[in-house]
């Protein structure tokens, strides 16, 4: 590569591009996250923040909300000496999402099955498979099951390399 040099070879002390602040210009991975660390909130804290979020938007007349994170994440945890299972987390999330769905039209990002009763639309419907080696054919099972039951929406199309093929996948799966 005529553009990049491996800094671990200690040959990067000269002939390298420098920024205005005299630091060596480095290439960062395009898939890197904006923040290095995220912390998970307890389900009770998530419910509290969600309640404030929903009330602030419904006061302004916004009745359609999209939620991500709590719709497709379950985890067990310990807090102040108590152990909570994924079932406990699911109960907390489902009761909170139930109350939110009574006030708003709720769009959930890849919701788990226990939340399908509360959602008005399924966002980011997976169109591909897991790409495991032992799979020889792909069947869009989830979209077949939910077709006509829930409105489904795919991932963002503008991030796809082959938009025509992706569009045909959406048509094929009914998304």
Describe each model-derived feature in a short phrase.
Residues 3-63, 71-175:
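Active-site-proximal substrate-binding groove within the catalytic cores of carbohydrate-active enzymes
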């Amino acid at each position: 590569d005529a553009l990049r040099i491996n800094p671990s070879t200690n040959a990067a002390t000269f002939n390298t591009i420098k920024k205005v602040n005299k630091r060596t210009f480095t290439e960062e991975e395009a898939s890197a996250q904006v923040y290095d660390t995220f912390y998970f909130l307890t389900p009770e804290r998530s419910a509290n923040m969600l309640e404030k979020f929903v009330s602030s938007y419904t006061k302004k007349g916004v009745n359609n909300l999209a939620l991500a994170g709590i719709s497709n994440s379950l985890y067990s945890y310990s807090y102040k000496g108590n152990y909570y299972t994924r079932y406990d987390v699911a109960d907390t999330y489902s009761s909170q999402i139930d109350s939110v769905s009574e006030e708003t039209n709720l769009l959930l990002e890849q919701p788990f099955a226990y939340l399908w009763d509360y959602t008005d639309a399924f966002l980011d419907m997976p169109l591909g498979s897991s790409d495991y080696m032992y799979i020889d054919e792909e069947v869009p099972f989830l979209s077949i099951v939910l077709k006509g039951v829930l409105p489904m929406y795919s991932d963002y199309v503008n991030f796809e390399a082959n938009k025509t093929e992706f569009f045909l996948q959406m048509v094929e799966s009914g998304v």
